[in-house]
Structures are given as structure tokens and as C-alpha cells.
Amino acid sequence: MEMKDFIFTSESVSEGHPDKVADQVSDAILDAILTQDPKSRVACETMVTTGMAVIAGEITTNAIIDYPKIVRETIREIGYNDSAMGFDWETCAVLTSIDKQSPDIAQGVTEGEGMFKEQGAGDQGLMFGFACNETPELMPMSILLAHKLVSRLADVRKAGVLDFLRPDSKSQVSIQYIDDKPVHVDTVVISSQHSPEVSYEMIKEGIIEEVVKKIIPANLMDSKTKFLINPTGRFVIGGPMGDCGLTGRKIIVDSYGGHGAHGGGAFSGKDPSKVDRSAAYMGRYVAKNLVASGVCERCEVQVAYAIGVAEPVSVMVDCNGTGKIPSKRISEIVREVFDMRPRAIIEQLDLLRPIYRKTAAYGHFGRELPEFTWERTDKAAIIREKAGL
């Protein structure tokens, strides 16, 4: 059998990337609303550009929210605190245009209304979950390292270790795989916004020493590993001044970095009645527990819904040929162990809480924070038992 030898690349972006600023603002607003009224319906979109943030969407809530204050606090925490950056939390304009959720949608989602008694899905659509045993977090290594690089960039910026850095940055990691196992980091790309007076040599040396070498395992690098640091040579203009940022523009960064499939729905700014978010989290929960159980080494789960209907129209489990038991039995176990109806997902994962701002940068998956209930592997034992392993 021919050996599989290929290079796979994933990217991530920092909390200061304009699209991620928008995601974090949308989720900060969602958290503020859920804190006061957990049953709220929220679809909050954000656009950020030079000197301005625009908030729009459909929100039905009893909460009383100071939208400009939340927007400004989020921008301040990210680090846009100087008008020289073209975006400053104290001076940026905040425009809002908020409507209520359509009653036609609401009756299909609200329990006891619409054509079905149970709480239905907030929309039609297909969502995917993924897990693999490449890393202890059961995430693909390329996206995990890409997230850790930009997270480290933010840490050294805020701590003053590399005080010339500014908030906007991106990373990209290319990994050589042999027979689907990561063996070598081929290329690391980092682009980070910086203050105008610093030399390129200082930027490159600082990022390689304080970021790359602190994150990329030494055993995966050698003399052939390529480091491309700020490859244009200059990155002073960045953030919302450099590019307009929009909620939901980084769906592959938010999920699995190109590994597995994606249904197209974004996460941020959406309350958990929206299955784009809650069912994607549930898909990760199912896939991660299957891999953690030892039933398979790699797993992709697809779930699909019709608007207003509680039961999924389909659930698919694909172990990419790594299953230790027949695929049909794995699918049966998933149906026996996991309830994929929207209300059940919300209850199992405890999603009516203000936990979403943390998800909005550095990945929704693979970060084992206490709030990230979909990262638990508490179903692995019962899966093993049912599989007879």
C-alpha cells in the first residue's frame, strides 16, 4: 500500500484581527443579554471599520443593554487604545440598528407554538463536528498550533515582552503528514501589526524567539523548517483601519482549520436556539467522545435540521476508516448516547449562560476551559462499554 505523504496548512487570526474584533463584540453583547435574560433570542452582527463600529441584528429580550459601553469595553480589552492605530475605544463611533426576531421564526422555535409542540431548530442547515487523536486536545495539530501562536502573540504584547506589537496578527502552520500522522512542521507564517519605528530585524527575531520557539515543539522543527515573519516587510496599518471587519467571516479559523467539512454557518452573535452554533458544539462533543473512547482515531459528525422541527433530519458519523467496530454500530451508539434535539443540546451543554465572548478568539474547539462543556469527554466510558472495548 502506497505511503501517504502530504503537507496540510491551517491558519488562525488574533483577537485584534478586524473580523475577530467583530466576533468578540457580537458575543460580548450576547453575553450581556444572557446575563439578564437567558431566554433571549439574539442574532447580533457587527461591522468595524476606521473609527466606527456598527451593530445590527434581530434581538428579542427583556434585558436592558448599553450597547456603546459593551462595544467600547471590548475594543479596549483587545488593545485598540490609541487613535494612531485608526481605531480607538474611546473615540470610535458606535451605530446601532436592532430589530426583534421575526414572529414567524419565533413560533417555530418557542416550545408549545408553531406546528410542533417541542422547541424546534432555529433554522434549517447542516453542521459538522470533528475530532482526531493527533494532539491531547483531540484536535488537528495544524490549527491547534496556529491558534497557540496568535494567542502567544497577544500574551507577549500585553505583558510588554514585545512592546512594539499591535493587536492585529495572523498565523499559518504547514505540517507534513505521513500516513495521516503529523511528523514535521514545514512552514510557519506570522504577520503581526507593529509600531512604525521598530526595525524588521527586531520584529523577526522577537517573534521567532518569544513566540515560535515557545509554541512549536522542538522535535517537529529542524533546519528545513521555514519561518516567514511579516513577509511584506511592514505591517503598521492594521486592524479595522486596514480592513473592514465583519462577524462570521472566520468560520474555518473558528472550527477545524480546513480539516473535516463545514456547513457554512457562523457561530458568534447567536444564542443557542440557533443550531448553527449549538449543533456544531454538539457535533464536536459527539466526535470528541468517540475518539476519546478509543472507538476510532478520527471522526466527523454531520447533523442537519429543518426549521421548527426538533428531531434532526439526519445524523451521519464517519470515522474515515479508523473505527474499531463496524460503522453501523458506531452510528447506533451515537443515537443511544446523545440526544440531538435543540432543547436537549442546550440542557446537556448548559448553553444558556454568558460564556461566549471567550469562544470568539483562538478557536471554539480544542480549548479545555471549564465553560467549554462540549470539550468534556464524560461520555467516553459509556461508549467504550457499549462498543465492548
From Swiss-Prot:
Cofactors, names only? Mg(2+); K(+)
Q: Where, per UniProt, does this protein localize?
A: Cytoplasm
**Family designation:** Belongs to the AdoMet synthase family.
GO MF annotations, alphabetized: ATP binding; magnesium ion binding; methionine adenosyltransferase activity
List positions binding L-methionine.
58, 101, 243, 274
Please give the name of this protein.
Answer: S-adenosylmethionine synthase
> Which residues are listed for K(+) binding in this entry?
45
Question: What is the protein's quaternary organization?
Answer: Homotetramer; dimer of dimers.
A Pfam family annotated for this chain is S-AdoMet_synt_C
Its biological purpose: Catalyzes the formation of S-adenosylmethionine (AdoMet) from methionine and ATP. The overall synthetic reaction is composed of two sequential steps, AdoMet formation and the subsequent tripolyphosphate hydrolysis which occurs prior to release of AdoMet from the enzyme.
As recorded in UniProt, coiled-coil segments are none
Principal cellular location given in the protein's record: cytoplasm
